[in-house]
UniProtKB/Swiss-Prot annotation:
This is Tyrosine-protein kinase abl-1. Residues 579-671, 736-775, 796-881, 914-937, 968-1016 are annotated as: Disordered. The keyword Membrane applies. Belongs to the protein kinase superfamily. Tyr protein kinase family. ABL subfamily. It is an enzyme of class 2 (transferase). A motif (Kinase activation loop) lies at residues 450-474. InterPro entries: ABL_SH2, F-actin-binding, Kinase-like_dom_sf, Non-receptor_tyrosine_kinases, Prot_kinase_dom, Protein_kinase_ATP_BS, Ser-Thr/Tyr_kinase_cat_dom, SH2. Its EC number is 2.7.10.2. ATP binds at residues 317-325, 340, 385-391.
């Protein structure tokens, strides 16, 4: 309970168990004239065997005769049942006369006596705290064994549950305490939704004021004691009808029709008006007036109850949705206390007291201590000890930093870990651990408070129910995705709390919207270490943020590590050393940035031609060894030294101005190479390029003009901006022509045009390379070779994996043809030291920049204020989101490694193991300008090593999440080990405009994707790209949903047909294993170019998804037509002789049952489109229909009992009511 924190919770799970009114089989009759005799009969009947026989355990032969849903008319009534009851309080009091008042003197109920114990029904959901209390759902039936001394609690045995699933069946027979006012006798009218008991005429009109025509309720008459009144709303007015009783104890409104029970009367008038102004259609929901007061514990009811006259309220400390927190004075003990007051009608009392019920069992020096409660009258209080410094969040923000050195911060964190370790050992979860919910007392003593969301775990995990809400930025991924919580979920929240403490109260994930947090976490991003944070503390944060709960430490281990850190006495020295490094790097980086700014300003005085050059400069504005200022929350060298001990580079992470984004964890640090290496090497090329002032520059794409101007900080003059734009537009046509003329479509490709916001590709170059190699001009075009390489890489990535290795002109430029420098492939171009690539990635993981999250196309927000950011970030925004890209290992170690033949042989061996790794996806917005051209077939291998890296690293992030994997939808799971890198990409990419745009050209491009076999020169194309996922033009694979794959399989036909065609096209296969894999797994199929007709036409993705399930919306006409079909089948079925069991009859039974099931599912969808009142009745009818359908379906068994005529009538009656409701 935070003094300055909101006392209200996001939501309380106790409200999530909302369910429909229970189904009861027993009717209710009117009261006798004498109250005493009526109560005596009621108690006797509640113990009678007749009532005890009617339960969910009742045989179908008894339950099958219900003609309609039981909310209005419980069947199976007889003359012995009574019509009504007095108030529930009288019933409880009378029922308790035979019980033992003192709990200590209560007798043990034997099996024989428990069978005669009174049967009660739960009116509301009750969630017991601890093992002594019995949790109930609304509608559950219990037998009362006894009461405590003040009758506030009763000990009950669970007799039956509303749901007869396996988990509930195991609970039958459990014994525990429940509040007396949460249950009512089985024959009580309180179980009906429409019965409101003793309410006034004006109250009934107020309740029906929010209803519609047909809304009604039944109440006790104010003027005629012992009789009832129906209040019904029609055309904006409320009409009241008294229910009369004749000499034979029958109830009626008009003399024409009379009834023995109130339930029968209400049901009749729900079908026929018969004197009422309209039908009784929509029962008005009643307030939970019965959920009144009860003591905190059944065994010690007065232990925590305090006299509110002893408490003097002082100033208000904080407030929230559900109540306020005050500073108070306790006169008896002469001490200051904190009082948490519940606002009237803000939340149910039992939910408010659940927090106190948990706190009373917790006693630890680092947990806020409960002193008592005041629950006898409103407002209700929870009283705890007073913490003078308020909550931890505000304390960190307002306190002078000099008073909170690092050693004090770590001590605070250690105290919190100690308290959480105590909760962990006692199987409690907090679920709302944050700085705002921790309180600070004198001498920096910290205690955990606010247990409103805390729960006791009977198993290893606790699952919150649908609709529960929690603080997103503090909740673990399994809690956000599946509402599953454990102590390891609190460990995740502790990592965020530790980050709050280290930043003196800053909000986590700065600049990230709540809707984007889960996407960042799922794709490996984590927050950077705070500035000056010691590596050991940041390491602990990252351990708490492991994706798999099993990989996170326990609180006792966290507490042990923090205590060791405190005792080491080296914490302050580490912090000072870290800050000194950061300051030195910042000074050096500022100096370099100022030089770049001066060059940029000097260029602004040149012509529009030079403006375009300067726009290119924004893509390559760093020198070979940049030192970027280490701003807040930037991962520094020491921050990640425990991840990569072999790191020797001194380059820090790149960050633009504005709030940073979380970096990936240690398994996912490789993507950061893309920007750091590009920034470090492209600067030399950019500077040389400026001095050469070549005329053949890339034109400004129309859609990137504003981005380019914004990136330069608005320094481009307006006139020059317009001239540059117009000049670029004039050059677009000629530039396109030169692009199309190039054999590979990459000779004149534009980086600014080819790479969109969602591009995942760049060309990282190692620092050790001589930058002069990349600034020489190509003899054919006179253009900068380095720029041509980048364009070529980005261009050819969209065509085929074979083109990944074509840009070796820097190593052996003479091998390129004069006509098309990048057009042909040859064996000399395969010069990649594969085995050194991982080492390079590992050695550069610390110097790489933090990946910038992609735009909203990938469901991650992008900083709007990145003016000083290099344009190279535009080309790498998705880096790190989907795992390391294969650009990491491309052309990295060309100069370092000279053993090309060995590398080539090693590469071929590697290819044979990795040739089925799926392509990756790069959403490029300008794919429409990229033609597909023929490629040389002389090469025997395919460069797919980067795919292996991507799949491997992505698997590291998610392969240990076994508790969560089965919850994931198909589109988020890996189809096999080699395709784990495609996890969750389709979910983000579905909303991407860029992805949708590039998908238009997939049909044209996919059949032309060449792929070479490692064991021959036969040129084949994959015919099952629809299985691995739709291949984007850039060469990546998108994971498909299950219904997409199913529809594609249907179009493909059987596996044997496809395999036979492939065998005809490729008659000679060298490896039997491949042939076996071809027939076994569709994802491994390969065919020749002649098999293009096997590939089905690509549908529009939106149509494909929506059309597969919701081809047409559920309409009233659809339901009516289905009803007519079932009606006809029903008539035909029962026209057959009942004794005749033929195959025809059996088949008709199954067909009709299936159609009824189809009707049930269709109506369930239709029910969501109608008014809430109609939905209530609709669902009741559907539930009844399902029961009848089940009974009829199994009645076709020759050994089964033949269908009774009453069941037929009941089914027909229920069926007719559904038809009337649909028509109405």
């Amino acid at each position: 309970m935070g003094h300055s924190h909101s006392t209200g919770k996001e939501i309380n799970d106790n409200e999530l168990f909302t369910c429909e009114d229970p189904v009861f089989d027993q009717p209710v009759a009117s009261p006798k004239s004498e109250i005493s005799s009526k109560l005596a009969e009621e108690i006797e009947r509640s113990k009678s065997p007749l009532i005890l026989e009617v339960s969910p355990r009742t045989p179908d032969s008894v339950q099958m005769f219900r003609p309609t849903f039981d909310t209005f008319r419980p069947p199976n009534s007889d003359s012995s049942t009574f019509r009504g009851s007095q108030s529930r309080e009288d019933l409880v009091a009378c029922s308790s006369m035979n019980s033992v008042n003192n709990v200590h003197d209560m007798n043990t109920v034997s099996s024989s006596s428990s069978s005669s114990a009174p049967l009660f029904v739960a009116l509301y959901d009750f969630h017991g705290v601890g093992e002594e209390q019995l949790s109930l759902r609304k509608g559950d039936q219990v037998r009362i064994l006894g009461y405590n001394k003040n009758n506030e609690w009763c000990e009950a045995r669970l007799y039956s549950t509303r749901k007869n699933d396996a988990s509930n069946q195991r609970r039958l027979g459990e014994i525990g305490w429940v509040p007396s006012n949460f249950i009512a006798p089985y024959n009580s009218l309180d179980k009906y939704t429409w019965y409101h008991g003793k309410i006034s005429r004006s109250d009934s009109e107020a309740i029906l004021g929010s209803g519609i025509t047909g809304s009604f309720l039944v109440r006790e008459s104010e003027t005629s004691i012992g009789q009832y009144t129906i209040s019904v709303r029609h055309d904006g007015r409320v009409f009241h009808y008294r229910i009369n009783v004749d000499n034979t104890e029958k109830m009626f409104i008009t003399q024409e029709v009379k009834f023995r029970t109130l339930g029968e009367l209400v049901h009749h008038h729900s079908v026929h008006a018969d004197g009422l102004i309209c039908l009784l259609m929509y029962p008005a929901s009643k307030k939970d007036k019965g959920r009144g007061l009860f003591s905190l514990s059944p065994n010690a009811p007065d232990e925590w109850e305090l006299d509110r006259s002893e408490i003097i309220m002082h100033n208000k400390l904080g407030g929230g949705q559900y109540g306020d927190v005050y500073e108070g004075y306790w006169k008896r003990h002469d001490c200051t206390i904190a009082v948490k007051a519940l606002k009237e009608d803000a939340m149910p009392l039992h939910e408010f007291l659940a927090e106190a019920a948990i706190m009373k069992d917790l006693h630890h020096k680092n947990l806020v201590r409960l002193l008592g409660v005041c629950t006898h009258e409103a407002p209700f209080y929870i009283i705890t000890e007073f913490m003078c410094n308020g909550n931890l969040l505000e304390y960190l923000r307002r306190t002078d930093k000099s008073l909170l050195p690092p050693i004090i911060l770590v001590q605070m964190a250690s105290q919190i870990a100690s308290g959480m370790s105590y909760l962990e050992a006692r199987h409690f979860i907090h679920r709302d651990l944050a700085a705002r919910n921790c309180l600070v007392s004198e001498h920096n003593i910290v205690k955990i408070a606010d247990f409103g969301l805390a729960r006791f775990m009977k198993e290893d995990t606790y699952t919150a129910h649908a609709g529960a809400k929690f603080p997103i930025k503090w909740t673990a991924p399994e809690g956000l995705a599946f509402n599953t919580f454990s102590s390891k979920s609190d460990v995740w929240a502790f990592g965020v709390l530790l980050w709050e403490i280290a930043t003196y109260g800053m909000a986590p994930y700065p600049g990230v919207e709540l809707s984007n947090v889960y996407g960042l976490l799922e794709n490996g991003f984590r927050m950077d270490g705070p500035q000056g944070c010691p590596p050991s503390v940041y390491r602990l944060m990252l351990q708490c943020w492991n994706w798999s709960p099993s990989d996170r430490p326990r609180f006792r281990d966290i507490h042990f590590n923090l205590e060791n850190l405190i005792s080491s006495n080296s914490l302050n020295d580490e912090v000072q050393k870290q800050l000194k490094k950061n300051n030195d790097k910042k000074l050096e980086s500022d100096k370099r940035r100022s030089n770049v700014r001066e060059r940029s300003d000097s260029k602004s005085r040149h012509s529009s031609h030079h403006d375009r050059d300067r726009d290119r400069e924004s893509l390559h504005s760093r020198n070979s060894n940049p030192e970027i200022p280490n701003r807040s929350f930037i991962r520094t060298d020491d921050s990640v030294s425990f991840f990569n001990p072999s790191t020797t580079s001194k380059v820090t992470s790149f960050r633009a101005q504005g709030p940073p984004f979380p970096p990936p964890p240690q398994q996912n640090t490789k993507p950061k190479l893309l920007k750091s290496v590009l920034n470090s090497n492209a600067r030399h090329a950019s500077e040389e390029f400026e001095r050469n002032e070549q005329d053949d520059v890339v034109p400004l794409a129309e859609k990137n003009v504003r981005k380019a101007v914004t990136r330069l900080g608005g320094t481009m003059p307006k006139g020059q901006r317009i001239d540059a734009y117009l000049d670029s537009m004039r050059r677009v046509d000629s530039w396109k022509e030169s692009t199309d003329a190039d054999n590979e479509g990459a000779g004149s490709s534009s980086l600014s045009r080819t790479v969109s916001n969602d591009s995942l590709d760049t060309l990282p170059l190692p620092d050790s390379m001589n930058s002069s190699t990349y600034v020489k001009m190509h003899p054919a075009s006179g253009e900068n070779v380095f720029l041509r390489q980048i364009r070529s890489k980005l261009k050819k990535r969209s065509e085929t994996p074979e083109l990944d290795h074509i840009d070796s002109d820097t190593a052996d430029e003479t091998t390129k043809s004069e006509k098309s420098p990048f057009g042909s492939l040859n064996k000399s171009s395969i010069k990649y030291p594969i085995k050194n690539a991982p080492e390079f990635s590992e050695n550069h993981s610390r110097v790489s920049p933090v990946p910038v999250p992609p735009s909203r196309n990938a469901s991650v927000s992008v900083r709007p204020d990145s003016k000083a950011e290099d344009s190279s970030d535009e080309t790498t925004k998705d880096v790190g989101m989907w795992g390391p890209k294969h650009a990491v290992t491309r052309k990295i170690e060309i100069v370092k490694n000279d053993s090309y033949p060995n590398v080539e042989g090693e590469l071929k061996a590697k290819i044979r193991n990795l040739r089925h790794v799926p392509k990756e996806e790069s959403n490029t917005s300008s794919q429409e300008d990229l033609p597909l051209d023929a490629t040389d077939n002389t090469n025997d291998s395919i460069i797919v090593i980067p795919r292996d890296e991507k799949a491997k690293v992505r698997q590291l992030v998610t392969q240990k999440v076994s508790p969560l994997q089965h919850h994931r939808p198909f589109s988020l799971q890996c189809p096999n080990n080699s395709t784990s890198s495609a996890i969750s990409h389709s979910e983000h990419a579905d909303s991407s405009e860029t992805s949708s745009l590039s998908g238009v050209y997939e049909e044209r491009m996919k059949p032309e994707l060449p792929r070479k076999r490692s064991n021959g020169d036969t040129k084949v194309v994959p015919v099952t790209w629809i299985i691995n996922g739709e291949k984007e033009p850039n060469g990546m694979a998108r994971t498909k949903s299950l219904r997409d794959i199913t529809s594609k399989f249907e179009q493909l036909g059987t596996a044997s047909t496809i395999e036979s065609k492939i065998e005809e096209a490729v008659p000679y296969r060298e490896h039997a294993l491949e042939k076996k894999g071809t027939s076994k797994r569709f994802s491994m199929l390969e065919g020749s170019n002649e098999l293009k007709h096997v590939v089905p036409p690509r549908k529009n993705r939106n149509q494909d998804e929506s059309g597969s399930i919701d081809e047409e919306p559920v309409s009233k006409d659809m339901i009516v037509s289905l009803l007519k079909v079932i009606q006809k089948e029903f008539v035909n079925l029962f026209n057959l002789a009942s004794s005749e069991i033929t195959d025809e009859k059996l088949q008709q039974f199954v067909i009709m049952a299936d159609n009824v099931q189809k009707l049930h599912s269709t109506c369930s969808v239709y029910a969501e489109q109608i008014s809430p009142h109609s939905k209530f009745r609709f669902k009741e009818l559907l539930s009844q229909l399902e029961i009848y359908n089940r009974q009829i379906k199994f009645s076709h068994n020759p050994r089964a009992k033949p269908v009774d005529d009453k069941l037929k009538m009941a089914f027909q009656d229920c069926f007719d009511q559904i038809m009337r409701l649909v028509d109405r």
